[in-house]
Each structure stands twice: as C-alpha cells, then as structure tokens.
C-alpha cells in the first residue's frame, strides 16, 4: 500500500512549474501570527536563498481524519476536547473519526489513503493518543498479562513520512504521557505539523483548541519556478522569537 501511494503521488516524468509551501508562524505564546508578507520570510535550500514570489493566507477549510488510540483521558474529557477543536475550525471543515483496528502505522497509512482518494486541498491527520504495548508482568503465570502502556510509533517511519510529504498532508498529534515519543514527533516535524506530548490530561482541551486555531491561520508561500522540486527547503522569519513550521503544499492530492 505504501509503495502504491508513493507511486501515485509521483508519476514518472512529472514536472512541477512552481513550488508551494504551507507555513505556520507562531508567537512565543503559541498563537498564530497574521499579516506577514514575502519580505518577512527567508527560504533556503542547501544554503542557497530562494525567491518568495507570494505569501497568501491558506484556505481555512480543512479535512481532518482524527485517529484515536490509547489516549489516557475520560470519555467526558475526550468529548470536550473534540468540541473545542472542531469549534476552532471554520464551518465548512470536515472531521472524520477513525479507530485503530490493527497497528497504528497501518491506521495512519489508511488515513492517508482516504484523504488521497477524496482529493481534498487541505488534508490533515490528527492522532489523539499514541501507540501502546503490553508491559511485562512480574507474575510468572501464563494466564497473567501485563497492563497496556504508552509506546512510540513503530514500523517504517521514514516511508510513512515520505508518504505524508508526497500528498502534502500535515500530521498533528496530542498524547498525555511521560513516555518519549520521538518517532511521532519526527513524523509531525517532517510534514510541517507538530506532535504535542503533555504531562497532564487537564491540558488536553486547551492544546487541541490551539491546534484548531493553528490550522485556520496558515500561509501558502509560492517560490520561484523550477524545473524540478528539490529537498524540502528551510523557512525562517526575521523575528527570532517566532516559531516557524513548514511543509509541502499542493492544490490536489
């Protein structure tokens, strides 16, 4: 499935006249920064500065597939969290819910496949939770299994990241745990999204609300025309206090 989707996203001999990036800019309080122009941005690839032709507000209408797995909260907290998240999206946005039937890596690929089939212009995968595993039990009986505990994503992380990038899908996540989730954080960073690891469930609702606001206040940067698209460039702004995240953007997926 992974290889087939990658092949579909990168047809042989395809040429792209211009390159577009989807960029998030946040202040030191985590709030989106509005009103930026091309002069505010610097884009470099392999140390060479690229020309920014235009900066426009991205469409605030998004299509989110929310995946639930191992989230350490009550049903009431989850319902409230979803309400805050959806309430910060525009009225035309779509949020579909997806559970994990097998492995989490498979669920993410299935979400990518679903978004690709719908040809949405602003596709998002949001993971609420994380992978899980059976903790070893100190009891020797074969009838006793350890409890489930939070765990990082396993599988071919680089290939999943490449698939998300090929389809210009942002990956976000929120997990309530003290377990390191380096692979999930890496996956989000590669796409221009972000994976939040929070220590307490009482911060879940506010974190989800911030993600919703972020999705509705992003930029599309158009770069100078090129006969081919190279490695993902580095995007920065003049103010060092601002946080910048960037990923690929395409009008079709």
Residue ranges and their predicted role:
Residues 12-253:
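Scaffold/interface architecture of coatomer-like assemblies
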Residues 1-8:
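Bacterial N-terminal signal peptides
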